Amino acid sequence: MERLTFSDAGPADWPYLLCLWWRNVRATHGFVAEDYLRAIGAALPGVYLPAMERVRLAWLEVAPAEGDGSDHAPGAGEGHFPTGTVAVPRPSQGRLPAGFLGSVAQRVEMLFVEPGLRGRGIGTALLEDFGSRHPETLLDVNEQNTAARIFYARRGFEVVGRSPLDGAGQPYPLLHLRRLRAGGAGTGQTA
């Protein structure tokens, strides 16, 4: 895996997070209605992100040729965003925003990775960074998001419940997942 660094994200980072979110949902949430995605995207910087106790941003260090001021991260394209919703930020100081995790207490509320960087351990690294501070990790995943369900199962998460509706009462069933840290060592294995 390439070198990753983490930082706590704040309002100055919201444009990065919004770009990552749009690219991710375009790649993984084809089952969600477009108007609902737009509503969530519109609320992300003003409602959802500020409601997080902590948002961790994973940065991928890139060689100068890769982080040369290009307007797009790997896999990005104008077709990923509804017109007028987001300005794509430039890479920052030789690094690209690779993913982020938003949390409240021991609950992961959001985890998104740049689609062009999936499979490189970024999501796992964000979960381990979070899990190192919490003996128990809770999260919800859309039941229709098969790739995410497999991702979490491979990292030791177990289904502990199901809701037929999402948190906003929409017909997108959620699976409630839980993972315990083994022996307090932050290994990511279930206890």
Predicted features along the sequence, with ranges:
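Conserved acetyl-CoA pyrophosphate-binding loop and the N-cap/start of the following alpha-helix
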Residues: 116-129
